[in-house]
C-alpha cells in the first residue's frame, strides 16, 4: 500500500466496516473464503471495542476460533506476569458467556510494538482474518505516519483485515 492510497483513505473514513486484502495475502485456493481463525486486536479504547461485535458475529457465523489480542509495551520481564494476568481477564470479560457454545475463544497478551505483535500472532496462528478498530479522530498527518498501527497491519498482514472506524 502506498502512502495516501485509496484503500487507506477508505478504511480511515468509511462509516461501515472495510475488508482490506493487502499485498501479502496469498491468492485463495478456492472460490469459497472461510474465516476459521479470527484475531480481534484491541487496545480497550471505545473505538477499538466497536470492532468486537463484528469479530464475534464472524466467529459465530463461520464456527471459527477467536483469539482476543492485546499488545502491551515492552516492560521488564518481572512485570510481564503481573500485567498479563489482569489483561487476560479483561480480554475474557469482553466475550459473552454463550460464546463458548459456538466458538473457541482464547486470550493472548503480548509485549511488543502493537503492529508487530498483531502481525506476529497472525503469522504464528495462520489467521484467516484480523479484526480491529481504527481511531476516527486521527489527524491526516498521523494517519499517514508509517508507524500508525492500522496502516502497518493492513500493509503487512498475511490475511485480510477488517477495520471498523471507532
Predicted features and spans:
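Short, well-ordered secondary-structure micro-motifs
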Residues: 1, 30-31, 51-52, 78-82, ...
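Gly/Ser-rich helix-loop-strand patches that form or flank binding pockets
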Residues: 1-27, 120-166
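Hydrophobic alpha-helical membrane-association signature
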Residues: 6, 51, 87-91, 149
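Small/aliphatic-rich secondary-structure junction motif
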Residues: 33-85, 95-99, 104-108, 156, ...
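Short, hinge-like loop/turn segments at secondary-structure boundaries
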Residues: 37, 83-87, 125, 148-150
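Alpha-helical elements of Rossmann-like donor-binding domains used by nucleotide-donor carbohydrate transfer enzymes
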Residues: 54, 90-93, 117
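Charged docking surfaces used in two-component/phosphorelay signaling
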Residues: 109-117
Amino acid at each position: 500500500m502506498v502512502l495516501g492510497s485509496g484503500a487507506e483513505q477508505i478504511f480511515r473514513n468509511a462509516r461501515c466496516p472495510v475488508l482490506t486484502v493487502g499485498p501479502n495475502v496469498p491468492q485463495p485456493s478456492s472460490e469459497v473464503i472461510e474465516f476459521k481463525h479470527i484475531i480481534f486486536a484491541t487496545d480497550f479504547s471505545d473505538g477499538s471495542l466497536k470492532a468486537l461485535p463484528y469479530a464475534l458475529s464472524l466467529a459465530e457465523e463461520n464456527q471459527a476460533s477467536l483469539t482476543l489480542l492485546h499488545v502491551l509495551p515492552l516492560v521488564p520481564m518481572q512485570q510481564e506476569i503481573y500485567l498479563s494476568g489482569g489483561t487476560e481477564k479483561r480480554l475474557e470479560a469482553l466475550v459473552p458467556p454463550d460464546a463458548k457454545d459456538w466458538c473457541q475463544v482464547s486470550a493472548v497478551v503480548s509485549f511488543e510494538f502493537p503492529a508487530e505483535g498483531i502481525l506476529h500472532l497472525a503469522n504464528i496462528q495462520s489467521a484467516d482474518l484480523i479484526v480491529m478498530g481504527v481511531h476516527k479522530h486521527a489527524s491526516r498527518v498521523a494517519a499517514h505516519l508509517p508507524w500508525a498501527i492500522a496502516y502497518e497491519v493492513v500493509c503487512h498482514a498475511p490475511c485480510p483485515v477488517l477495520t471498523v472506524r471507532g
